[in-house]
Amino acid sequence: MKNKKGGGAQLWGMVLYDIIGDGCLNGVWTNTHTESKKIMNEIARKKKNDEKDPIAGEYYVSWIEEKGGPVSGTLKVESKITHYSFEWIVSGKTSFKGVGILLGEKRLAVTYWDGESIGLPVG
C-alpha cells in the first residue's frame, strides 16, 4: 500500500475485505501508485476488545509490498454509524486513513489515502 511513484500525485486506493467468521478481515487492494495496477493481499486479525460492533476495534495487520516485502502494523477501525473510519499505523506513525461501508453482511469496501494528507482524496 506504499507510495511508490511519488511525484506529487496523491496516493489513494481501494480495499475489498471479506469478513471471516473468526474476526479476521481478508482484503485485496490496489492503489494509484501500484505498478501495473496489480491487486495485492492484506490480512487483519482482530485483537481482543470489548467493542459491541463486530467490525470496530484494533487489528494486527500485514501486507506484502510489490517491491519491498512484508509490512506489519495496526489497523484501527471505528464505527461512525453509517460507515467506518480506518487508520493503518506502521512503526508508530499513521500510514493511511480511509472510510468504508458494509456490502451485505460479509464484505466491506474501503477507500484509503496517504495518511499525511488532510481530508478525502477528492478534488
Ranges and model annotations:
Residues 1-123:
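Central antiparallel beta-sheet cores of small beta-barrel/beta-sandwich binding domains
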